[in-house]
């Protein structure tokens, strides 16, 4: 399960809509409890370095990722996942999403995927990569009004 405030989710949506018709991406910052549930406390936008296929691929800027990692290294918060958009496609994990997650062995992370249809958010789902079969499975995405 992943939870975040409605305000944070709205800010992520704003990023995805502003980036349309290209994919955008960013990192989710927060905490993980003993049951492996994530709580997002912040996020950081990351540049999409993919100039050739930006409409259906993202290549997260490694410097942006590293900046986010360093910003929170002496805090109780850490990178707990990634978000990205799917312009004019469903909010389901694609084979490319799966292949990349397996490549970096990101089994403990949540992946929020936002479907943006004709410039407006249509849906959002969160996914977790299973270590046992290298497939994404949907996890509950909960928003809380007062969790920011």
Please provide the spans of the model-predicted regions.
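Residue-level "edge-of-site" marker
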Residues: 85
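Conserved beta-strand-loop surface patch within small alpha/beta domains used
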Residues: 1-79, 88-148
């Amino acid at each position: 399960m992943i939870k975040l405030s409605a305000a944070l989710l709205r800010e992520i949506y704003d990023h995805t809509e502003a980036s349309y018709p290209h994919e955008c991406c960013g990192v989710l910052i927060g905490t993980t409890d003993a049951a492996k549930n994530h709580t997002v406390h912040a996020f950081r936008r990351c540049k999409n370095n993919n100039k050739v296929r930006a409409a259906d691929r993202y290549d997260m800027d490694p410097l942006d990722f590293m900046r986010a990692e360093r910003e929170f290294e002496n805090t109780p918060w850490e990178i707990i996942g990634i978000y990205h958009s799917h312009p004019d496609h469903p909010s389901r994990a694609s084979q490319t999403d799966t292949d990349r997650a397996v490549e970096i062995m990101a089994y403990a992370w949540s992946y929020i995927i936002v479907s943006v249809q004709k410039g407006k958010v249509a849906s959002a789902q969160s996914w977790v990569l299973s270590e046992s079969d290298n497939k994404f499975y949907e996890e509950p995405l909960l928003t809380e009004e007062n969790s920011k």
